[in-house]
Every structure is written in structure tokens, then in C-alpha cells.
């Protein structure tokens, strides 16, 4: 079985090596196709990627947005399974083998999601209560639950490329919640399998999109929930979004106080 992993990157010199090595170090009974879509980086990203040119496909061109880069990479992909991993996130050891084994055990499965943790600039786990909460929701998947709250973590989500070709691709209209619209598109086609293993780590740092845009992210998610659901699920999503926004703000306040003390 062949897995295609796409990494969009622009000026990602700080973490790209860690991301690449977490992918290329994966071992198991599968074939890996790794495509890095660089948006004409002006830092040392391309020099770092050059070290791995024999083990991955590197495309460097202006793409306009991460969504466009991922869509382009998916068009190039030749694997049966697809995913993307952003240029600051990492796979856990054994992730791709777990994914392959799950799809083999469940041949009708079209997509799956697993557990994910949040890490800082130094790979240290942070915000454990949020991780626990989202991973707990993962046990109770239904389309309506997903409409009321986005609990699926992007770095730990994988799909059959046949499904990708049957849904709308990533929408550049959204700046922070484009993965959520993809989940809703996929949910309209098939029910995912929940893998009860840690598959990836999502890095939260000062330059990350989600770190600086969580208000925008939840507003976009609310719009998507209204588009794919009804008044009830949209209201529930609004309640849950406000709750999470305040939790994030409180965590930021506590973190700032800890730095000053």
C-alpha cells in the first residue's frame, strides 16, 4: 500500500527538518511518497530540503496559500492513502504503519482520525486538558457531533485518495478552518474510523496560524457549521466555540504570568 504525504511550507526553516525527519523515519509494510510544496521560500528552507532531495519530491513555486499548495500536492500524489503534515508538526514513530494496518483491516474505510497532542517549540507537550478533551470527543463521533464542535485533529487524519477525488478540495476562502470544511465534506460521503492511538503532534508556537487566529478560526468554523448543518447544530457550535476561545485566552493569560514570575 502506498501513502502520499504532502507538506506545504513557506519560510519554515525553524521546524522543517524536524517535520521531514518525522516522516522519512517512518518504517513498515508500505511505500512512502513524500511531496514537499514550497512557496518560494526566502530563508534557508530550500537549502535544508536539498539534503533530502533523494528521498522526497520537492516543488518550489508561488502557490498563493497553504491550501493551494496542498491541493497541488494532492494532484501530484499517486498513493492510495493521502494526508498532509504542516511544516511544523510531526508524526509519532509508527504512525504510517498503524494507518496502513487500519485501512487493511477495514477495507471499506474511506478515512480515519487518531489522537494528537499539542507541543511547544521544543517538542514538549503542552495544553494537556485540551488534548484530553478533544481525544475524549473522538470516541463519540457522529456527523452532528462534528457539526457542533470540531474535535478532529488535522495532523492525525488520513483518507483514501478515491475519497479525496470525490469531495471539494481545500477552500482558500478560509484562513484558519479549511480543514474543518474538508472533514464535513468527507463526513457527507463516509463515516471515519477512530484510531485510539497517538499518531501526531501539533506544534503551537508564536508564528503558527492557529496561535494567532483562533478567533478567526472559530468564526470560520461557525460559518461552516451553519453551511453544512442546521440552526440547532450551528447554535451548539457557537456555544462550544465561545467556550474554547475563552479557555485559550485564559491559558494565554496564565502562560504570560508564568513567564513574568
Model-derived segments and spans:
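Short beta-strand/loop segment that forms part of the nucleotide-sugar
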Residues: 31-40, 59-62
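Short, acidic, metal-binding catalytic loop of nucleotide-sugar glycosyltransferases
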Residues: 21-31
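Conserved nucleotide-sugar donor-binding catalytic segment
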Residues: 128-220
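Acidic helix N-cap motif at the loop->helix transition within catalytic regions
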Residues: 14-17, 43-51, 90, 94
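Glycine-rich, basic loop-to-helix element that forms the pyrophosphate-binding segment
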Residues: 61-77, 98
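Short aromatic/hydrophobic "clamp" motif used to bind/position activated sugar donors
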Residues: 82
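Conserved donor NDP-sugar-binding/catalytic core segment of glycosyltransferases
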Residues: 90, 94-128
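A conserved acidic beta->alpha catalytic loop
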Residues: 22, 38-47
Amino acid at each position: 500500500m502506498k501513502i502520499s504525504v504532502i507538506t506545504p511550507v513557506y519560510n519554515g526553516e525553524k521546524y522543517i527538518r524536524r517535520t521531514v525527519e518525522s516522516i522519512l523515519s517512518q518504517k513498515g509494510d508500505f511505500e512512502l511518497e513524500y511531496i514537499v510544496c514550497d512557496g518560494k521560500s526566502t530563508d534557508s528552507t530550500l537549502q535544508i530540503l536539498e539534503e533530502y532531495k533523494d528521498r522526497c519530491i520537492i516543488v518550489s513555486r508561488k502557490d498563493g496559500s497553504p491550501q493551494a499548495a496542498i491541493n497541488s500536492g494532492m494532484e501530484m500524489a499517486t498513493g492510495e492513502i493521502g494526508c498532509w503534515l504542516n511544516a511544523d508538526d510531526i508524526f509519532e514513530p509508527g504512525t504510517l504503519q498503524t494507518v496502513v494496518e487500519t485501512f487493511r483491516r477495514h477495507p471499506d474505510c474511506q478515512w480515519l482520525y487518531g489522537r494528537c497532542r499539542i507541543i511547544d517549540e521544543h517538542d514538549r507537550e503542552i495544553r494537556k486538558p485540551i488534548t484530553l478533551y478533544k481525544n475524549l470527543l473522538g470516541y463519540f463521533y457522529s456527523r452532528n457531533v462534528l457539526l457542533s464542535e470540531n474535535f478532529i485533529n488535522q495532523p492525525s487524519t488520513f483518507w483514501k485518495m478515491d475519497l479525496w477525488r470525490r469531495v471539494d478540495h481545500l477552500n482558500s476562502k478560509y484562513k484558519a478552518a479549511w480543514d474543518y470544511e474538508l472533514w464535513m465534506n468527507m463526513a457527507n460521503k463516509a463515516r471515519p474510523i477512530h484510531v485510539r492511538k497517538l499518531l501526531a503532534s501539533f506544534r503551537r508556537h508564536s508564528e503558527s496560524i492557529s496561535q494567532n487566529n483562533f478567533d478567526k478560526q472559530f468564526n470560520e468554523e461557525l460559518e461552516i457549521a451553519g453551511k453544512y448543518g442546521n440552526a440547532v447544530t450551528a447554535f451548539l457550535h457557537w456555544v462550544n466555540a465561545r467556550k474554547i476561545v475563552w479557555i485559550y485566552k485564559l491559558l494565554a493569560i496564565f502562560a504570560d504570568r508564568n513567564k513574568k514570575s
